[in-house]
């Protein structure tokens, strides 16, 4: 029987909900792994889920902490419904700022305060052996000034947005020499933070850059391949039948959390100017701005697009990647890795990719499809035409770089790497 405990801490004003069972006492006597992720939008809830799965595989009891607004999120409901004493969830909101306290100088400080608050509240109720932060970029650059938010508790963080080194390793990114130099210095200080056991990164070039000038007494820096759920291509004819798609049409897929940064606006404008355009599939939950844009422009597209503005199930995701002819990765201002790129590779689909960041680096190095030098309608149109007529290229021996890099991007490999650092 599931029980919900609601506790209001008088001093902090925190509302904490912890899902538990009648048999929870024995489990709670063990030392838990604490996973803190305040935001369950986009891909972040997936990382929290995968880390919990890894803990379960290894027999580590764990607790996910997120903000109260996420009580109705599918992951929160899933954990609650499973009713497992070794898989707990708690909800903690940021502390309301007292009127007499100055505001935090930046977002890094604000998030550091939140993570420290979570650790303080949870450790009053439960012994914690290790903290795992799926997205350490929330507060990473505050560490040289504020220290660890977790006291003496050892912890592991995953960085997804460390881009200051990209110019040094041949990745196209904004040229900000002063900002990059400052962040490089802060990075070297941050990895010496007390309690930080390992900094994992989804960028394979960061450990390489760090090894050039290793920091004394710093945490280990290790590459963890950005995973995507382990799926394999279905028969495209059957996938199209299930989706109600035309077996003779060409389809270009835009997948994931659909925002302006996906380059969706530029893509739609380019498609309206393109003769013999493929049918656009936009699959994933849209933000308000994108939803408004699509509503106003959907009639200008010919053929009419398929718009799935909703959470995409694993089965539908598999059908979408199986049925499409190419995948759009012409993102804007995104310099990190993309799970969508991994999935396109896994399903053998060419991509139309930005030249920026890790998406461009992987796409060029692994020969995944046309690379966009810009997001003009002309460039996009040429790339779409090339993709639909010339890709994938005639089968050749797979480049060793492609096999070595992208074959590691599996959920199993992610869990294995994580558990090696948690042991």
Task: Locate predicted features.
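Conserved donor-binding/catalytic core segment of Leloir-type glycosyltransferases
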Residues: 245-262, 268-271, 281
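A charged, aromatic-enriched C-terminal amphipathic alpha-helix characteristic of glycosyltransferases
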Residues: 375-379, 389-422
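Short hydrophobic beta-strand element within catalytic cores of glycosyltransferases
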Residues: 326-327, 350-355
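A short helix/loop element that forms part of the nucleotide-sugar donor recognition site in Leloir-type
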Residues: 232-245, 393
């Amino acid at each position: 029987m599931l029980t919900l405990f609601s506790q209001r801490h008088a001093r902090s004003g925190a509302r904490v909900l912890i899902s538990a069972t009648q048999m929870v006492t024995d489990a709670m006597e063990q030392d838990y792994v604490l996973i803190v992720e305040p935001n369950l939008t986009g891909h972040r809830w997936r990382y929290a889920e995968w880390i919990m799965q890894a803990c379960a595989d290894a027999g580590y009891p764990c607790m996910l902490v997120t903000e109260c607004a996420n009580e109705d999120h599918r992951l929160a409901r899933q954990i609650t419904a499973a009713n497992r004493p070794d898989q707990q969830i708690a909800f903690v909101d940021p502390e309301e700022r007292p009127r007499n306290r100055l505001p935090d100088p930046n977002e890094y400080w604000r998030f550091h305060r939140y993570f420290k608050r979570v650790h303080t509240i949870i450790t009053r109720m439960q012994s914690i052996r290790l903290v795992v932060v799926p997205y350490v970029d929330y507060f990473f650059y505050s560490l040289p000034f504020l220290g660890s938010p977790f006291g003496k508790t050892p912890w592991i963080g995953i960085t997804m947005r460390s881009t200051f080194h990209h110019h040094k390793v041949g990745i196209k990114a904004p040229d900000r020499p002063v900002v990059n130099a400052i962040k490089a210095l802060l990075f070297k200080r941050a990895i010496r933070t007390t309690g930080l056991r390992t900094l994992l990164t989804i960028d394979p070039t960061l450990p390489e850059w760090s090894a050039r000038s290793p920091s004394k007494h710093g945490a280990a820096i290790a590459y963890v391949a950005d995973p995507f759920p382990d799926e394999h291509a279905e028969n495209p004819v059957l996938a199209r039948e299930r989706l109600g798609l035309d077996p003779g049409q060409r389809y270009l897929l835009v997948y994931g959390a659909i925002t302006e940064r996906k380059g969706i606006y530029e893509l739609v404008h380019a498609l309206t100017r393109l003769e013999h355009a493929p049918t656009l599939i936009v699959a994933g939950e849209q933000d308000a701005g994108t939803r408004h844009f699509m509503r106003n422009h959907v009639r200008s597209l010919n053929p009419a697009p398929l718009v799935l503005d909703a959470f995409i199930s694993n089965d539908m995701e598999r059908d979408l990647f199986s049925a499409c002819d190419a995948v759009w990765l012409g993102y804007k201002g995104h310099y990190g890795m993309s799970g969508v790129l991994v999935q396109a590779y896994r399903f053998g689909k060419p991509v139309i990719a930005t030249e920026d960041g890790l998406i461009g680096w992987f796409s060029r190095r692994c020969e995944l499809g046309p690379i966009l030098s810009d997001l003009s309608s002309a460039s996009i149109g040429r790339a779409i035409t090339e993709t639909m007529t010339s890709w994938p290229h005639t089968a050749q021996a797979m480049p060793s770089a492609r096999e070595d890099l992208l074959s590691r991007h599996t959920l199993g490999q992610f869990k294995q790497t994580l558990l090696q650092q948690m042991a």
